[in-house]
Amino acid sequence: MAAKKPTGRRVDGWKAKSWYKVYSPDNVGKVYLGDTVADDPSKLMGRVMQAPLSELVNDYTKQNVKMKFAITNVAGDAAYTSFIGHELARDFIRSLVKRRTSRIDCVVNFVSKDGCKVRATVTCFTLTRADQSQQHEIRKILTDDVLTFGKENELGVFVNNIINGDLAKELFKKVKELHPVRRVEVIKTKVELPKSSA
C-alpha cells in the first residue's frame, strides 16, 4: 500500500519572493536596468545585469557596446549596481579589420585609484600594414598611457572616458604620430571590485 502524501498548505515559491528594480551606477546616470526577483535581498548581491550602452546614454551609435553591472547594494525594493566590465560586439570589431592593414591588441592590468583591479583590452586598427617594430612601439604607447591614466584615476573616471570616447581619442592622437591609424578602441574591460564594494 502506497504511503499517504503529507497534507497541508503549500506556499507558492513566487509568492515568497519580491521584485526589485535595478539601477546603473551614479556615474552612468543611475538608469533603470530592469527588474529582478529574490526571496532574500542578500541573494541579489553579485547578480549581474547587462545593457547596451545606447540605452544608458540615449545614443543609438553606442549600440555595439555591452555594459555589465553587478548588484552591490539593496535599499528597500531598489538594487544598485557597480560597473564590472564592458565589451564591444564581435561583429563590430570584425568590421573594423581591413585587408593590408594591422590590428594591434594589448592587454593592460592596473589597480585604479579607488582600489579596483581592472583588465583593459585596447586595440588599434591601422590604415596601412605596420611592421613589427612599429607594432611594438604602438603597443608600448597604448599600454603606457592606459596604465598611467588608469592608476591615476578612480574607476568612475576611467569608465566615463571609455563611454564618451575621450580615452580612445587621446590614444589615437598619440599613435597617429607614429603610423597612419583608422581607429583606436578600448574593446573590453573586466573589473574586480574591492571586497568592501563587492
UniProtKB/Swiss-Prot annotation:
Q: Single Gene Ontology BP term?
A: translation
Question: What GO molecular functions are on record for this protein?
Answer: structural constituent of ribosome
* Domain of life assignment: Archaea
Q: Does the keyword Kinase apply?
A: no
Which residue pairs form cystines in this protein? none
Q: Which UniProt keywords apply?
A: Ribonucleoprotein, Ribosomal protein
Gene Ontology CC entries for this record: ribonucleoprotein complex; ribosome
In Pfam terms, one family for this protein is Ribosomal_S3Ae
HAMAP family in the cross-refs: Ribosomal_eS1
Can you tell me which family this protein belongs to? Answer: Belongs to the eukaryotic ribosomal protein eS1 family.
Protein name in UniProt: Small ribosomal subunit protein eS1
List the top taxonomic levels of the source. Answer: Archaea, Methanobacteriati, Methanobacteriota, Stenosarchaea group, Methanomicrobia
